[in-house]
Design a protein with these regions (language model features):
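Helix-loop junction within the histidine kinase core
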Residues: 29-40
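Conserved catalytic submotifs in the C-terminal HATPase_c
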Residues: 5, 39-44, 61, 66-77, ...
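Short alpha-helical segment of the dimerization/phosphotransfer core of two-component systems
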Residues: 13-18
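Short conserved segment of the HATPase_c
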Residues: 135-149
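Short alpha-helical Gxxx[C/S/T] motif in the catalytic ATP-binding
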Residues: 159, 164, 168, 305
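Disordered, acidic interdomain junction associated with two-component signaling
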Residues: 58, 62, 70, 118-120, ...
Length: 354
């Protein structure tokens, strides 16, 4: 039975590899003959990145890599674009990063909306970075040419047609964007893609929410950019926001706010903090008698920690990369749930009323 399973696994792996080679060749052929056309539809960039994370997670776990995904300053997450081709570009870049990063390495994807575009459109920058084997400057000059692969012992052992980057470059060009690469042998590689998209109409934009307006939140994350980004999102929905990079500082802020009578209405805490994790921060906040909603941010699958987190007093989870719609929906649910709990009638015991 074990031998049969091994054979079936090898057959499946070989079949998938052969299929990917054929698809690359067909795509390149269609591109060169002008038969590929973009089909724009309504697309949520939040969905694109969360789906990408789901698709690539198997490869990430198989190679024991760390994957970090983030979204910065994205005020327009609903756009018009060819979702299939955008996914193809991102998967090509991310799969390459995984492929050429040794076990224990780190791969990151960061999406940022750039300022200064014409009304009705927006420019987005996507950076895919790894700390893998990198590339020589000689190879970088021809990386976007068809069938080109770097001739090193490490790369030669890695499967591929050498068409992925050529296809990616052609799709980016068709979308009216640009792609560049920064790399050094032994230090890793970063691909930087900039793409212009038409944004969806005004009714899709996030406005201030009456139920959240004026409420105060504390953001706790050891990454300054995340604190800054989440704070901007909270201000956009009408909340007041403070932030700190430390779990211990967060607990101190909570204690001070309670003593001053200016308590927080929500806590947004990263799971992986350097001084104490988000669950321990939650325990310490709850030990102060504070029942304010606590939302844990995590770039990982939270199923393994969910029971422990709930027992510690965590109200809800929110997955990175974090978008406006994610934080808005999670806040509305968490704060609404907390208010409902407070409004429940207190059960009366008749035992001592005889």
């Amino acid at each position: 039975q074990k031998r049969v399973r091994d054979y079936l696994g090898k057959i499946l792996s070989s079949s998938n590899h052969l299929l990917s080679l054929i698809n690359d060749i067909l795509d390149m052929s269609r591109i060169e003959s002008g038969k590929i056309h973009l089909e724009e539809t309504e697309v949520s960039l939040s969905d694109v990145l969360h789906d990408l994370k789901t698709i690539i997670s198997g490869q990430i776990h198989a190679k024991q890599l760390e994957l970090y995904m983030d979204a910065m300053d994205v005020t327009n997450e609903d756009v018009y674009c060819d979702k299939t081709r955008l996914n193809q570009v991102l998967l090509n870049l991310l799969s390459n990063a995984v492929k050429f990063t040794p076990a224990g390495g780190t791969v990151s994807v960061r999406l940022k909306q750039l300022p200064g575009t014409a009304k009705g459109s927006a420019l987005y920058e996507i950076r895919v970075k790894d700390n893998g084997i990198g590339m020589s400057q000689e190879f970088v000059k021809k990386i976007f040419s068809p069938f080109e692969r770097e001739r090193t012992s490490t790369v030669s052992r890695t499967q591929g047609t050498g068409l992925g980057m050529a296809i990616t470059k052609n799709i980016v060009d068709m979308m009216g964007g640009t792609i560049e690469v920064q790399t050094a042998q032994g230090k890793g590689t970063e691909f930087i893609v900039r793409l212009p998209f038409r944004i969806q109409p005004e009714q899709h934009r996030i406005e201030k929410i009456a139920e959240l307006e004026g409420l105060k939140a504390l953001v706790v994350d050891d990454d300054f950019d995340t604190c800054d980004s989440v704070t901007k999102m909270l201000v956009r929905v009408g909340m007041r926001s403070e932030w700190t990079l430390s779990g211990r500082e967060a607990v101190l802020r909570v204690r001070q706010s309670m003593e001053l009578g200016d308590a927080f209405h929500a806590y947004i805490i990263d799971w992986c903090l350097p001084d104490m994790n988000g669950i321990e921060v939650t325990r310490q906040i709850r030990s102060l008698g504070d029942d304010t909603p606590i939302i844990i941010l995590t770039a990982y699958d939270w199923s393994d920690i969910e029971a422990e987190a709930k027992a510690a007093g965590v109200t809800a989870f929110c997955a990175k990369p974090l978008f406006m719609s994610d934080i808005r929906d999670t806040l509305m649910t968490a704060i609404g749930q907390n208010q409902a709990e407070q409004e429940k009638p207190v059960p009366v015991s008749y035992t001592h009323l005889r």
